[in-house]
Regions:
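Active-site-proximal catalytic alpha-helix in oxidoreductases
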Residues: 59-87, 91-104
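Rossmann-fold dinucleotide-binding core
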Residues: 1-65
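Helix-loop-beta segment of a Rossmann-like dinucleotide-binding subdomain
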Residues: 14-29, 77-88, 141-152
C-alpha cells in the first residue's frame, strides 16, 4: 500500500502535478514489515526522482490521510473551489483546522494511530499555529494544483472516501460539527457533478 507525495489532475492525456515537499511518497506493507519487495519499490520510486518514506503503520497512515484530504476538499468546495479563496477566509481555515482535529479525534477513538507523527503534532498545537500555517500554504500558487485541482477532479472519489470513513468512525454532530459540515460539502460537490452530467445528456 502507498500514497504519492504529489497532487494534481489530468488535462486530456496529460497529467499535471507538483511534488509536495512536506509529504514524501509513502509506502508500507499491510503487516507493518519492511519487506524486500517494499524496499525494492522504494528504490524504484527514488530512482524515478520521488522522495520516499517507509511506514510500519501504513493502514493508519492512509486512514489519517483520508480524513485530512476529505476535510481539505470540503473546505475548498465551500470556498468556490479555490485554495486561494480559502486562504483568504480566516473563518473557513479555522473550520478546516477544527474539522481535521475532530476527524483525528474520531480516528483515535476508533483505535487508529494518527500518522505521520509530524501531522499529528501540527494539529495538536494551539489552533493559531496550524491556522496560520494553512493560510500561508493555501495562498501559495502551487496549492491550486496540489489541492484545488485534485479536489475538483476527484469529487466522486472524495465522497467515496467519506463513505468509507463513516464505516470506521461515527462523528458526534454535537462535538464534530465542523467535520460534518466539511463532509457535507464533499457530498454536495459530488451530487452537483452528477447533476451536470445528467443535464448534458
Amino acid at each position: 500500500m502507498g500514497f504519492p507525495g504529489a497532487g494534481g489532475h489530468r488535462e486530456g492525456n496529460t497529467v499535471r502535478y507538483r511534488d509536495i515537499a512536506e509529504q514524501p511518497t509513502t509506502v508500507g506493507e499491510p503487516d507493518g514489515s519492511l519487506s524486500q519487495r517494499l524496499r525494492s519499490l522504494a528504490k524504484l520510486l527514488a530512482e524515478a526522482g520521488f522522495k520516499v518514506a517507509l511506514s510500519r503503520r501504513m493502514d493508519d497512515w492512509l486512514k489519517t490521510h483520508a480524513v485530512f484530504v476529505t476535510a481539505i476538499a470540503g473546505a475548498i468546495y465551500r470556498a468556490e473551489g479555490s485554495a486561494t479563496v480559502l486562504a483568504r477566509r480566516r473563518d473557513c481555515v479555522r473550520a478546516l483546522v477544527r474539522g481535521i482535529r475532530q476527524g483525528f479525534s474520531a480516528l483515535s477513538a476508533a483505535g487508529v494511530v494518527i500518522e505521520p507523527r509530524k501531522l499529528a503534532l501540527l494539529f495538536a498545537l494551539p489552533a493559531v499555529i496550524p491556522e496560520s500555517y494553512w493560510r500561508r500554504y493555501l495562498a501559495h500558487p502551487a496549492a491550486e494544483l496540489i489541492f484545488a485541482g485534485h479536489a475538483q477532479a476527484a469529487r466522486d472519489e472524495m465522497w467515496a472516501v467519506v463513505e468509507e470513513l463513516r464505516e470506521i468512525v461515527t462523528p458526534d454532530p454535537r462535538t464534530h460539527a465542523e467535520l460534518e459540515t466539511l463532509w457535507a460539502a464533499v457530498e454536495t460537490a459530488a451530487s452537483r457533478k452528477h447533476s451536470l452530467r445528467h443535464s448534458e445528456r
